[in-house]
């Protein structure tokens, strides 16, 4: 990787809200791509039911997702600077949690929490970039997953319609595909290749 790209990737901290099927893969993709500062936020523990689509292993069952994922990421790149927070995001704490992050990847499960997070962060920070994900449930239709600029500093990855309530299941390939869109966009924004 060119030195100027490495320098750019070392200057931005990326916050990831939610470390399930989306967030765990986003973090792994960014770490492998050379992003040096990651901020991992989740309140949950790894459950055996997560293993079919999230970036965890049997040995991680019962552990905090933040701790298990941080350990994996440091095994990929021991020079990473990782901040972890084991908290549930709320309207009261979300703005403060992401204060030092230049790019925020929203990867939470609940539509209500997604909406709260987007609204809270936009109200607090006009200059931060928010990458949200919506519409990744089910299988197939890979090309339906898109990355769209919704407004200044707000991007949406997914097909915008395939939820667990309509598709009945989440699958590793579609979750990872949407996560790859989010991570690829974050990289492009950091490197100045996308506006």
Question: What are these model-derived regions, one by one?
Answer:
Residues 1-195:
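Adenine nucleotide-associated cytosolic modules
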């Amino acid at each position: 990787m060119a030195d100027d790209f490495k320098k750019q990737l070392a200057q931005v901290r990326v916050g990831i809200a939610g470390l399930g099927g989306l967030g765990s893969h986003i973090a792994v993709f960014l770490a492998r791509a050379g992003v040096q500062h990651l901020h991992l936020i989740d309140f949950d523990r790894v459950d055996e039911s997560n293993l079919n689509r999230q970036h965890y292993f049997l040995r991680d069952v019962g552990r905090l997702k933040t701790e298990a994922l941080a350990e994996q990421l440091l095994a990929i790149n021991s020079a990473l600077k990782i901040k972890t927070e084991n908290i549930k995001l709320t309207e009261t704490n979300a703005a403060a949690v992401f204060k030092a992050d230049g790019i925020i990847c929203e990867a939470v499960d609940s539509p209500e929490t997604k909406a709260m997070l987007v609204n809270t962060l936009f109200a607090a920070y006009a200059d931060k970039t928010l990458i949200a994900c919506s519409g990744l449930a089910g299988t197939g239709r890979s090309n339906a997953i898109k990355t769209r600029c919704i407004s200044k500093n707000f991007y949406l990855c997914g097909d915008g319609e395939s939820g667990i309530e309509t598709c009945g299941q989440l699958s590793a390939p579609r979750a990872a595909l949407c996560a790859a869109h989010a991570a690829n966009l974050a990289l492009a924004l950091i490197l100045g290749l996308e506006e």
